[in-house]
Design a protein with these regions (language model features):
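A short glycine-rich, Lys/Arg-flanked "PGG" loop and its adjoining helix->strand segment in the class I
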Residues: 16-28
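Core SAM-dependent methyltransferase catalytic element
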Residues: 86-113
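C-terminal alpha-helical "lid/dimerization" subdomain adjacent to the S-adenosyl-L-methionine
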Residues: 35-92
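A short His-aromatic
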Residues: 8-10
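A conserved beta-strand element that flanks and buttresses the S-adenosyl-L-methionine
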Residues: 2-3, 33
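A short hydrophobic/small-residue beta-strand
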Residues: 32-33, 96
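Hydrophobic beta-strand segment of the Class I
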Residues: 1-2, 89
Length: 113
């Protein structure tokens, strides 16, 4: 199962439930991979990384109206910390859980059934 930039729209309880449902849907040895936005462990760190992301997006040439629209949409995000999400995967039964990539407020993590 592969997901990208979707699960952060769910409540924490819905995230936990979804991880359990994904685990149940996988065959033994199956893999769940999620590319996701996350909330940093502290508000200060999150603000710092979010500001760096905005700066980088501007450096890469994002149009200001597009960036403004993205920032407006982000107000409705319900991101959880990366640590919480990895723990919820463990609780659902996943093993060999790993964060394969992390940059600012984005990560790719995975686990095996």
């Amino acid at each position: 199962v592969v997901s990208a930039l979707s699960i952060h729209h769910l409540s924490d309880e819905q995230k936990r439930s979804l991880f359990e449902r994904i685990y149940g849907a996988l065959n033994d040895g199956g893999v769940f991979v999620n590319a996701e936005q996350f909330r940093c462990a502290t508000p200060e760190r999150h603000r710092f990384h979010h500001e760096r992301w905005v700066t980088r997006v501007r450096e890469l040439g994002a149009a200001e109206p597009d960036l403004a629209a993205a920032l407006d949409r982000m107000k409705f995000d319900r991101a959880a910390t990366l640590e919480d999400q990895l723990e919820w995967m463990r609780q659902a039964g996943f093993r060999d859980i790993d964060c394969a990539y992390k940059n600012l407020i984005f990560a790719v993590y995975c686990g095996l059934k």
